[in-house]
């Protein structure tokens, strides 16, 4: 069974890289992930760029933009210590309220950033490692992550769930903000439907997440006071084709990006200007859910994978390297 999974993973890697599945891996060459004009390179590996970042000015507001490259990065989702309520004591350590250094550190952490609203806000459902923490809501925008750390974003009940994508984690947060490269009509509707602001003031610091035409994952955030329309415009300016709002209000938007894969706690210099928190809080445990970006192995013929949801119920999802040219554990 393991040999079948290894072969399937290698074929998937070859397909993603645009290589004929019948070609010999020893005779293949892979184009590195290259820098792009207008972006500053963050973390790199032998594969090329893993993350990059920039500041984007939209409607007079500066946004931090952080991008995970689809060919060189993978994604994980973690619960918080207090939200979702009780999840910390139920989920395995690979999805707990702190970066799981013994396992995720093998790959190398390249970025961390906040999740969505708390469960009490009734902004959507979530699932991790086979454990449903809140029921999925039809019509809500969903970020899905599979056993290889690949991501897909779509509206639940439309493009997700999908027979071709098998998630180990799901996170919803309200309806779609960007679809087909355009703001949705809901973005212009009642501003209070996009989150409960402090002191009834609808313009607040906000964060968002989206996927561009190349499949890259893009996080945007500002500590300036904005509404959902401006957040959506920032996602569009960053190249997002499908996007959603994440958490809001001054206390919750948090981002940290490294300049190289971290195998132990280290510097995260790429941050949201004027954020209220050092992103290193995710290293030791944080109260709310968050995402972790990791680096793929240096070899194009090796990938980090977890077991997947092969049975019903809770299934821990530790990473292991599969393929050829993999790092020694």
Q: PLM features: residue spans?
A:
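Aspartyl protease catalytic domain
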Residues: 77-238, 309
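Bacterial N-terminal signal peptides
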Residues: 8-18
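Zymogen propeptides
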Residues: 25-135, 304-329
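Positively charged n-region of N-terminal signal peptides that target proteins for export
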Residues: 1-6
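Extended C-terminal subregions enriched in glycine
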Residues: 178-180, 194-306
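Conserved hydrophobic/aromatic beta-strand scaffold that supports enzyme active sites
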Residues: 63-67, 142, 176, 208, ...
């Amino acid at each position: 069974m393991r040999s079948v999974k290894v072969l399937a993973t290698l074929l998937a890697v070859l397909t993603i890289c645009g290589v004929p599945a019948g070609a010999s891996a020893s005779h293949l060459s892979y184009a590195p992930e290259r820098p792009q004009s207008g972006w500053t390179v963050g973390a790199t590996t032998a594969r090329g760029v893993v993350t990059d970042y920039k500041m984007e000015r939209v409607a007079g507001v500066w946004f931090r933009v952080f991008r995970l490259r689809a060919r060189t990065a993978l994604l994980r989702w973690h619960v918080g210590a207090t939200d979702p309520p009780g999840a910390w004591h139920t989920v395995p350590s690979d999805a707990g309220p702190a970066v799981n250094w013994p396992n995720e550190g093998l790959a190398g952490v390249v970025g961390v950033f906040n999740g969505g609203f708390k469960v009490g806000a009734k902004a959507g459902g979530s699932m991790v490692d086979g454990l449903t923490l809140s029921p999925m809501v039809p019509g809500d925008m969903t970020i899905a992550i599979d056993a290889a750390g690949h991501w897909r974003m779509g509206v639940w009940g439309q493009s997700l769930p999908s027979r071709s994508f098998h998630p180990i984690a799901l996170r919803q947060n309200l309806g779609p903000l960007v679809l087909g490269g355009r703001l949705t009509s809901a973005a212009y509707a009642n501003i209070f439907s996009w989150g409960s602001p402090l002191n009834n003031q609808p313009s607040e610091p906000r964060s968002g997440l989206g996927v561009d035409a190349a499949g890259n994952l893009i996080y945007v955030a500002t500590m300036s006071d904005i509404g959902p329309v401006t957040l959506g415009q920032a996602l569009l300016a960053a190249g997002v084709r499908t996007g959603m709002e994440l958490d809001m209000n001054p206390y919750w938007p948090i981002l940290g990006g490294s300049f190289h894969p971290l195998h132990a706690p280290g510097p995260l210099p790429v941050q949201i200007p004027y954020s209220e928190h050092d992103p290193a809080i995710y290293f030791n445990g944080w109260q709310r859910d968050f995402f972790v970006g990791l680096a793929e192995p240096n070899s194009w013929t090796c990938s980090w994978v977890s077991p997947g949801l092969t049975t019903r119920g809770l299934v821990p999802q530790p990473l292991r390297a599969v393929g050829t040219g993999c790092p020694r554990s």
